[in-house]
Curated annotation (Swiss-Prot):
Function: May be involved in splicing.
Location of the protein in the cell: Cytoplasm; Nucleus
Biased composition (Basic and acidic residues): 27-37
Residue spans of biased composition, Gly residues class: 60-74
Native source species: Yarrowia lipolytica (strain CLIB 122 / E 150) (Yeast)
Gene this protein is translated from: SQS1
Protein known as: Protein SQS1
Start and end residues of each stretch annotated as Disordered: 17-101, 188-284, 409-435, 511-540
Pfam families registered for this protein in UniProt: G-patch (PF01585)
Length: 812
C-alpha cells in the first residue's frame, strides 16, 4: 500500500490510480484459472458460506471459512488484491490525519457517494520519533530560558557570595566578554516518552553573550532557538567557567521567599504592629524565672496552645516575639496581675472579646481571705487527722455504759474498775509476744477460714507439711502448734497468747470476755423465756402420749415432731411384724390389715405379669387392641404357633395388611419365608443387625386353603420346630443355638467331648530324629529307651495325662 496522505478531491487526479466503486471496471482484468473456481468476478457480494469477500478481491476462506461459495483460501489471482487499488476501509484505517482533517467530510456524507479517492505521495516519510524529538527540544529550550531568567532576577539580591559565583562584577564582564567566550553548562533532565530513550540528560551550553550552543545537527532549529534566547536573557548574566551550584541557589531562594512572606503579612495590617507595641509597653514584663527554683533550672517546657478556637488569635500568637528559645503558654488565662508579681512558665494573654463559647472560664483565685484564718483552718484539719476514733468510742462507752462493736447491747457493771483499762491491758498483752520473721507459727502458715463446731472452733489451715493442701484443724492442733512455737507445753500455754497468734494468722475467734459466760447481767434480767420453754415441753409430752395410744394412721403427726418409732424385732419371710402395741385387739387388727394388703399386692403383681406376657402393655395393644408377636412370644416360637398366627391374620375381620414377626436369625427367617409362600403372602425383611425380622404383606391371592403346600412344608419342618426369638435378653447361648445348625459355619463341625478320667495324648507321635533337641541328647550319650538325667535315673516313659472335669485344680 502506498505510504502518505489521501485527499478527497476531484481536480488534478491521476488517471492511472483512479477507480470508482459504483461502476464496473472499463477494462476487465484477466485472471488465472484458479480465480474461476475460487471466487466470483462480479462485484456482487458472495452468498455462500460465512464469507465477506467480494468479486474483485476473491474469496478469503474455504468451504466453511470467510470466503465466497467455497473456493481456495487466498482467492483467485495470487497477490491480486495487493497489486490493485486498496479498499476504502483500509485506506481510512491506515491514515494518520483522517480523524482531524476530513472528519466532517467522511461522516456527514455517505461512503457510497464518494466517487473518487486520490492518493498522493508525501514529500518525506512519516517518522514519529522525529516529531517527538522536536517537541522535546522545544520543551527543553523553554525550561532553560525560564531558569536563566530566574537566576538573573534573584541572585543579585541575595548574598555577595552568590554574586561572586555568578560573575556579577562589571569589570570582569567588560574584559571577558570582548576577549573570550565563556560557556556555562546547565543540565536539565526531563522524561522523554518517545523512541529515543537512551539519552536521559541533555546538556545546553550558554556562551558569554547569553546565546545557547547545542549539539543538534539541524541548522534551522538552532537559528530559531538562538533568536528566542537572545530576546529573553539579560546581558548582565556572565557565567563562570565552573558549573553553578544549584543547592546554594535553592537555599538563597528559600530565605528570600520567607522574608517576602513576612513583609506581606506586615503590609496587610500596618496598624497592628503599632497597637501591639503600645500594649506591650503598658503591660507588665514577664520573665522566665528558672534561676529561683533549683528544680526548674534544667526543665524543658512543652509548647501548648490556648483552648480557644480562634484563627486570628493563633496568627497573633505566632507573630509574638519570644523572650527565649522556648516559650511556655499556660492554658489558664490570668485575670489580673500586679506589676510586682513574677510568674514562672506563663505569658501574658490579651483580653479575648470574641472567645469561643465552648471555652471554659476558670474562676480566679480570691485573695480577700485572711491568711491567719486560712492557717488556723488548715491546722485544725491536721489535728483531726492525727487523732483516732478510740477516744470518741471510750467517751461514748463511759456516757452510755454500753459495749460497742458487738451484735448485742448489754449493760456493763459500773463497779468493775477493770473495764476502764480494758484497751490498755490488751496493748500490754500484745507487746509481750513477738511475731516470727518467716510468718510461720509452728507448722501453720495461714488460716484461711474459721467455723464454729459443737466442740469448739475449726480452722482451714495452710501448713508446711503439705503446701498444696488445706485441711480443717481443731483447736487442739492449733494449740499444739502455738505451744511448739513458744517452747512451752500445751497446759502452760496462756489463752491470751493462743488468741493473739490465732488472730494474727487470720483466725476469727470470739473473745471469752464478750461471750455469754463473761456477761454480767444487771437487775433487768428476766427468766420468762425459760418458763415459756418449759410450758411448751409439757404440751409436747402430752401430745406424744395421746398419739401413742391412738391408731397407727395417726402416728404421722409424731414424725413431724421428730418422733422415731421403736425398732421391730427381726422376723422371717412372710411373718407378721411386731407393731409394738400393748392393746391385743389393736395388734390383731393391724396383723389382719397387713395380711390382706400383702395378698392384694401379690394378686395384682401376678395379674400384671400375665398381661405383660400377653402384650397388653404394649403401644400397639393400647392403640389398636392388637397384641404384637414379639410381646406374645418373647423367647421361642414353634412352627405350629407361627402357622396359627398367620391364619388368625388372614381371617381377621378388619383385614390388616402387615404381620410382623419377632426378630430372628437368618436360618429362622428363611423358614418363615417358606411358610409365607404356602399362604401366598409376600415376605419382606426389616430392621438392622439383631433387630431384623420378617414382615408378611397381604396380597390378592392370600388364602388359607392351600393344604397341599402346608403339608409339604410340615414334612420338611415339623410342627415342634422351634424358632428362637432375639429379644432384649438375647444371650450368647441363644446365638450359639442359632448358628450351630447353619451351613458353612465353623460351629457346625463335630466337637470332641472328653469324659471324666479319660487318658489323652497317649497316641501322639514321638519326636522325629531330625529334631534339634533329640540330636543334642544323642550327642551327649542318650539312646532311645534310656532314662534322662545323671546315670539314667530319670523316667523312661512319658507322663500320663488324664481329664478332670469335676475339679479345676490348684492355682486355677
Amino acid at each position: 500500500m502506498p505510504t502518505g496522505y489521501h485527499n478527497f478531491c476531484d481536480d488534478e487526479l491521476d488517471e492511472s490510480i483512479n477507480f470508482n466503486y459504483n461502476r464496473k471496471p472499463s477494462q476487465p482484468k484477466d485472471y488465472d484459472d484458479d480465480s474461476r473456481t475460487s471466487g466470483r468476478t462480479t462485484p456482487k457480494r458472495a452468498r455462500g458460506g460465512r464469507g465477506r469477500g467480494s468479486g474483485d478481491r476473491g474469496g478469503r476462506g474455504g468451504s466453511r471459512g470467510r470466503g465466497g461459495n467455497g473456493g481456495s483460501s487466498r482467492g483467485g489471482k495470487k497477490n491480486g488484491w495487493r497489486d490493485e487499488k486498496p479498499s476504502l476501509l483500509s485506506s481510512i484505517l491506515n491514515s494518520r490525519q483522517h480523524a482531524s482533517e476530513n472528519r466532517e467530510h467522511m461522516f456527514n456524507k455517505s461512503l457510497r457517494g464518494a466517487e473518487f479517492i486520490t492518493f498522493i505521495k508525501s514529500a518525506e516519510v512519516y517518522d514519529p520519533s522525529k516529531l517527538l524529538k522536536d517537541v522535546g527540544v522545544t520543551v527543553e529550550e523553554a525550561n532553560v530560558v525560564n531558569e536563566v531568567e530566574d537566576i538573573h532576577i534573584i541572585v543579585p539580591e541575595v548574598i555577595p557570595e552568590v554574586q561572586d559565583v555568578t560573575g556579577a562584577d562589571a569589570q570582569l564582564e567588560d574584559q571577558e566578554s570582548e576577549d573570550e567566550e565563556v560557556v556555562t553548562t546547565i543540565t536539565e533532565t526531563y522524561a522523554d516518552d518517545g523512541d529515543n530513550q537512551e539519552d536521559d540528560d541533555d546538556e545546553m551550553l550558554v556562551d558569554g553573550n547569553g546565546q545557547l550552543v547545542d549539539d543538534y545537527d539541524d541548522d534551522e532549529d538552532d537559528d530559531d532557538e538562538d533568536d528566542e534566547i537572545d530576546e529573553e536573557v539579560d546581558d548582565d548574566l556572565i557565567a563562570d567557567e565552573n558549573a553553578v551550584d544549584v543547592s546554594t541557589l535553592q537555599d538563597a531562594i528559600n530565605e528570600v521567599a520567607n522574608d517576602t512572606i513576612n513583609d506581606d503579612r506586615k503590609e496587610e495590617d500596618p496598624s497592628e504592629g503599632s497597637e501591639a507595641d503600645d500594649e506591650e509597653d503598658e503591660a507588665a514584663e514577664f520573665v522566665m524565672d528558672t534561676e529561683g527554683d533549683p528544680d526548674m533550672v534544667d526543665m524543658e517546657f512543652m509548647e501548648t496552645d490556648f483552648a480557644y478556637l480562634n484563627k486570628k488569635k493563633r496568627a497573633e500568637k505566632s507573630r509574638t516575639p519570644l523572650t527565649s528559645s522556648t516559650a511556655v503558654i499556660s492554658d489558664r488565662p490570668v485575670a489580673s496581675v500586679s506589676a510586682d508579681t513574677t510568674l514562672v512558665g506563663s505569658v501574658a494573654s490579651k483580653k479575648r472579646h470574641n472567645a469561643d463559647p465552648r471555652a471554659v472560664d476558670i474562676p480566679e483565685y480570691n485573695s480577700d481571705i485572711d491568711p491567719e484564718v486560712l492557717k488556723d483552718y488548715i491546722e485544725s484539719i491536721k489535728n483531726e487527722d492525727e487523732g483516732s476514733d478510740a477516744e470518741n468510742i471510750d467517751w461514748i462507752r463511759s456516757a452510755l455504759g454500753t459495749q460497742l462493736g458487738g451484735t448485742e447491747q448489754y449493760y456493763v457493771d459500773s463497779d468493775d474498775s477493770e473495764n476502764d483499762d480494758f484497751d490498755d491491758d490488751d496493748e500490754d498483752d500484745e507487746e509481750e509476744y513477738e511475731w516470727p520473721e518467716n510468718g510461720t507459727v509452728g507448722c501453720i502458715r495461714n488460716i484461711v477460714a474459721t467455723r464454729a463446731a459443737s466442740q469448739g472452733y475449726q480452722f482451714m489451715v495452710e501448713h508446711t507439711l503439705d503446701a498444696d493442701m488445706e485441711e480443717w484443724w481443731n483447736e487442739d492442733l492449733i494449740r499444739d502448734s502455738v505451744a511448739e512455737h513458744l517452747g512451752v507445753s500445751v497446759s502452760e500455754l496462756p489463752d491470751e497468747a493462743y488468741r493473739w497468734y490465732v488472730t494474727r494468722l487470720g483466725g476469727d475467734i470470739e473473745d471469752p470476755d464478750l461471750s455469754e459466760e463473761g456477761i454480767n447481767y444487771s437487775d433487768y434480767y428476766d427468766d420468762s423465756d425459760e418458763d415459756e420453754k418449759a410450758r411448751e415441753a409439757s404440751e409436747m409430752d402430752s401430745l406424744i402420749q395421746s398419739l401413742i395410744d391412738d391408731e397407727v394412721d395417726d402416728r404421722k403427726a409424731l414424725m413431724d415432731h421428730g418422733y422415731t418409732p421403736p425398732m421391730t424385732k427381726s422376723r422371717g419371710k412372710n411373718q407378721v411384724p411386731n407393731f409394738g402395741v400393748n392393746d391385743p385387739e389393736l395388734q390383731a387388727q393391724l396383723e389382719k390389715h397387713w395380711v390382706n394388703s400383702r395378698a392384694a399386692k401379690r394378686a395384682k403383681r401376678e395379674q400384671r405379669q400375665a398381661m405383660r406376657k400377653q402384650g397388653m402393655f404394649t403401644k400397639e395393644f393400647k392403640q389398636g387392641g392388637i397384641i404384637p408377636l414379639h410381646a406374645k412370644y418373647p423367647i421361642l416360637m414353634t412352627v405350629e404357633e407361627a402357622r396359627k398366627e398367620i391364619e388368625i391374620f388372614i381371617n381377621a375381620p378388619n383385614k390388616p395388611m402387615v404381620l410382623d414377626f419377632p426378630p430372628m436369625g437368618a436360618e429362622f427367617r428363611s423358614v418363615l419365608k417358606k411358610l409365607s409362600a404356602c399362604y401366598h403372602l409376600k415376605p419382606d425383611i426389616h430392621g438392622v443387625q439383631k433387630s431384623k425380622h420378617v414382615s408378611m404383606l397381604r396380597t390378592s391371592r392370600t388364602s388359607c386353603h392351600n393344604n397341599n403346600y402346608i403339608q409339604k412344608f410340615h414334612d420338611k419342618f415339623p410342627k415342634k420346630f422351634k424358632l428362637v426369638i432375639r429379644n432384649a435378653k438375647y444371650s450368647t447361648e441363644q446365638y450359639l443355638y442359632e448358628t450351630k445348625h447353619q451351613k458353612g459355619s465353623k460351629r457346625s463341625a463335630v466337637r470332641v467331648h472328653n469324659r471324666e478320667g479319660e487318658i489323652v495324648g497317649h497316641e501322639a507321635p514321638a519326636i522325629d530324629d531330625s529334631n534339634i533337641g533329640r540330636l543334642l541328647l544323642q550327642k551327649m550319650g542318650w539312646t532311645t529307651g534310656e532314662g534322662l538325667g545323671a546315670q539314667s535315673r530319670g523316667i523312661s516313659e512319658p507322663i500320663i495325662a488324664k481329664v478332670k472335669i469335676s475339679k479345676r485344680g490348684i492355682g486355677a
